Amino acid sequence: MKPFVRHIIHALLAVLFCTGIGFIVYNVRTQRKLVTVNGLKVEFADSLKFVSENDIKGFLASNYGAYIGQRLDSIKLRIIETMLESRSAVLESQAWTTEDGILHVRITQRAPEIRFDNGSEGYYIADDGYVFPLHKSYTADVLSVHGNIPSMPTSSYKGLAPTSEQRSWFSQMLEFKRVAYSKKGPAKKIDSLWVDNSGDLRLRVANEEEIFVFGAPEQLEDKFAKIDKYFAYIKPLK
């Protein structure tokens, strides 16, 4: 077979192959346009309980509108993600559809580091200092601070604390928790922690009766070391 004939045959085969692939892609896209959403599947990336599957379904129904029965290619996935991420307890969301007509939503909840509550006002802060409201029926298992806590503008406030002084204090409290939980002695086992009327931290260690006036959340290593030394050397002599 002459070379130019071979080249022509190869070219024709390539054209036929590309045409076939194009037809398959076109057919798949055409079929996809005919598929409508018939269900919603919600999954969570963590074990927190700030939002539930029913919460997500209700939120989408109220804010996005009808999606069941809509064509897959008409679902505005980015809008859904943005809506869900407007909720204070949702850190990130991902939305996608599959050929079986299911709208999938994956939720990553905002993880709290410290809970603040004085009985009439309360909120969480995350590791970046983001403030978000307490949940009506779920309490995260994190360090809790009571008493004379900083006041937020509203009970539903979310975002960084409104004043630089509050943001600085929250940053110190996050460092307080990190240092406390890194300890191996009794100071690690904080049972109660509150802010008194003077703004000083006071704490009680689990299974102990002593109340320690910790003061401002600074000089952390030295203060925690003193608490540990008290239980190691002073209390046994009493």
What is the role of each PLM region?
Residues 37-55:
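Short extracytoplasmic/periplasmic juxtamembrane "stem" segments immediately C-terminal to an N-terminal membrane anchor
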Residues 1-42, 59-71, 75-78, 82-86, ...:
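Charged, solvent-exposed interaction patches on well-folded alpha/beta domains
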